[in-house]
């Protein structure tokens, strides 16, 4: 029933638009930039003039969330429109499943050309990898298996290449060259640009580090990386204007999770790795001159799983016939200025799993040596369903956001299998300091409804995790 409902929901926008009328899409994502790590959100030191300008001219989301509290799962949510636990992407270093349908695959069927640039972190850099960018719908890719630093190695469609320069600028230059070729063909495009900044280790080039000469060395490098990324965003915006495609290009910027210890949460509770606001609320801005004529700020809830259905609706493309259950919802009404409240609650779930470390340069250097020797190894299997998960035990920290209210379900450390609950009103208490649960009878019905909704959603996620969506 849920899948049929989704298909009916999109039927009204499924009429395919002529190619010339379809917007282009650029999805930019920072790596570990917290909610408070921008000038426009009040950082007292950090210089982000381009992001500040975007926040003044575009649509600024003040309640936008990463679908997970760490990187790989969030990236998987962007690609699929689904909570990452549905396809077993529990933590950093986990991959997509080959059965998933990505936004690149869906837009390719609608006539788009697709490119990925920068951090991938949800699959192999080998061309034959089941979850490589190429086997996830991208026509062209200059990608890194994880975070990357200056003068990075990239995998270009599976072949290792060298680059020279500040990491964000190198990534942007590659993307602009590719966009220029798409513009010459007059073909709508999807460019996914996932920066390596400001993930540690922090090594800013002198030009940007010098801007923070009065700060401790570590902070100067951290701030310098963000300002360098900001400047690269500026080059991207200038570049698409010069190419004449800016007016009908949707440029969507956000981060993959909340702040790291050196970063700023802007006063929100906790940091990267936590489902409290400081771990998942992230900066987010959309620019689209053809549609967003003046600055708007929205407090409507949104998250990275919404990107997939939003782009498909904007492209006038139907959902694939075999589309698995979506967690995201289209934010087109927000772009059109016609929505103030999100009707669909948002679920978040940190499933208890250890991450898998990936050292980008070492992995790509190993691949390069294999290629130079003419003895490239086959990619390892990725995204396999290796077990069945029970639906009666739902471990880990989960949250359920419905309007202004956020319910936490937290495992009790001393008593395995038991959970404690907390409730916060994000409009009045964004820092999540005042737990509203107790003897408040006025909230009893709401809490019961939220608990029921969260439990049903978790069971749905486990069914997806066990492969039900692919049968």
Language model features with spans:
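Formylglycine-dependent sulfatase
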Residues: 2-5, 15-422, 430-471
């Amino acid at each position: 029933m849920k899948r049929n409902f989704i298909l009916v929901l999109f039927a009204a926008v499924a009429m395919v638009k002529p190619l010339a009328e379809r917007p282009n899409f650029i999805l930019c994502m920072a790596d570990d930039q917290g909610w408070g790590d921008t000038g426009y959100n009040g950082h007292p030191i950090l210089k982000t003039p381009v992001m500040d300008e975007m926040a003044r001219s575009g649509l600024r989301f003040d309640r936008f969330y990463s679908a997970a509290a760490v990187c790989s799962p969030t990236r998987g949510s962007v690609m699929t429109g689904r909570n990452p636990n549905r396809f077993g992407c529990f933590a950093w270093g986990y991959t997509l499943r080959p059965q998933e349908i990505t936004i690149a695959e869906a837009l390719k069927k609608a006539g788009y050309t697709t490119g990925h640039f920068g951090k991938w972190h949800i699959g192999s850099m080998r061309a034959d990898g089941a979850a490589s960018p190429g086997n996830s719908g991208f026509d062209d890719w200059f990608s890194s298996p994880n975070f990357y630093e200056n003068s990075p190695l990239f995998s270009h469609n599976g072949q290792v290449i060298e680059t020279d320069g500040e990491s964000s600028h190198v990534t942007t230059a590659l993307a602009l060259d590719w966009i220029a070729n798409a513009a010459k063909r007059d073909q709508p495009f999807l460019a996914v640009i996932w920066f390596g900044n400001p993930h540690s280790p922090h090594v800013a080039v002198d030009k940007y580090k010098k801007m923070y000469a009065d700060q401790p060395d570590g902070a100067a490098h951290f701030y310098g990386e963000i300002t360098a990324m900001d400047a690269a965003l500026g080059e991207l915006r200038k570049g698409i204007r010069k190419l004449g495609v800016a007016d009908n290009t949707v440029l969507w910027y956000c981060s993959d999770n909340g702040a790291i210890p050196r970063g700023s949460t802007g006063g929100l509770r906790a940091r990267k790795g936590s489902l409290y606001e400081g771990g998942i609320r992230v900066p987010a801005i959309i620019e689209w001159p053809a549609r967003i004529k003046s600055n708007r700020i929205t407090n409507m809830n949104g998250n990275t799983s919404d990107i997939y259905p939003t782009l498909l609706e904007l492209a006038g493309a139907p959902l694939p016939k075999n589309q698995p259950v979506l967690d995201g919802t289209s934010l087109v009404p927000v772009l059109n200025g016609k929505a103030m409240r999100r009707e669909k609650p948002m679920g978040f779930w940190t499933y208890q799993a250890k991450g898998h470390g990936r050292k980008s340069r070492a992995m790509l250097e190993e691949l390069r040596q294999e290629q130079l020797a003419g003895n490239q190894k086959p990619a390892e299997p990725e995204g396999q369903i290796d077990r069945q998960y029970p639906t009666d035990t739902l471990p880990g920290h989960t949250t359920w956001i419905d309007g202004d209210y956020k319910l936490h379900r937290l495992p009790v450390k001393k008593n395995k299998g038991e959970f404690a609950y907390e409730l916060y009103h994000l409009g009045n208490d964004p820092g999540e300091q005042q737990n509203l649960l107790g003897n408040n009878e006025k909230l009893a019905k709401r809490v019961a409804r939220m608990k029921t909704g969260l439990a049903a959603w978790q069971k749905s996620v486990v069914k997806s995790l066990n492969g039900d969506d692919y049968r």
